[in-house]
Amino acid sequence: MSDAAVAGGRTARRGRLGTEARDARRALQLVLAAIWLLDAVLQDQSFMYSKAFSQMIGGTAAGNPGVIARPITWNANLVEQHAVLLNTVFATIQLLIGLGIAFRPTVRVALAGSIAWACAVWWFGEGLGGVLSGAANPFNGAPGAVIIYALLAVLLWPADRVARAPFTAARAVGAHVARALWLVLWLSLAYFALTPANRAPQALNGVITAMETGEPGWLIALDNGAASLVRGQGLAASVFLAVALVVIAAGVYLRPPAAKTALVLAVVVAAVIWVFGEALGGILTGVGTDPNSGPLLALLALAYWPLRTTVPGEEKAA
């Protein structure tokens, strides 16, 4: 075979690898868009137009420093006074973000808007996810589901710093930054799992049973089974979870086969958190504003799945 033919074959294979990477990022963007659209639908539930919604927002101020709590209380009072108008605005913003990400020409504007909106909601609506109040727990959505939306927007930004990134999340910010962001997130979850409040004997049991109100019977049965397993085992459960989270955090620094194992573990942990700790984000109760952190953590793991960045036979031929 001539050198020209070999070179042409390599170029074609490189093109296919580039297309694979582009398609992977676009697929993840579309999943993120679907979650934003689900949020918009959930935001339009009747509960969100009631006084109870503003009270739920106000409750996130508890335990936070005054400089953080006062704006939350102000926001809750404002929502109470103008519930219909403001909740309609909230739902519309989320709808526009979802549609904007799904529509390729507006994806940059929508992702940028989602970062700004997520940061505002993280403070004014989630009380920074309980990070400063001592209430943060991986099983109740720490460090705040909405800040993970912002992280995903950054990692799925349609730009390329390197020609062939090792995983999708590295394309926009580079592998070193992407791995550092992953490390910070999962190590923070490990830290939250080991805080004194979460090591208490009945801590995890209480988190699981607290989500039962309004759930369908089958989900209550699942949660009750999980709660019984961890009854009085708060310390052991916290240590076990923290170890798993540390393994996940370090996984993206390993070679692809080991990294894939760590990422599968991340998806499994995200699923366990979502089903048993977050009760599917409360989306079946009529009061859930979003699916919570579980699906977002799983989506994040997919963004770090190793891509095939070398052309088969290329190194041998060289």
What is each residue range found by the language model?
Residues 2-96, 103-318:
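Extended, low-polarity transmembrane helix blocks
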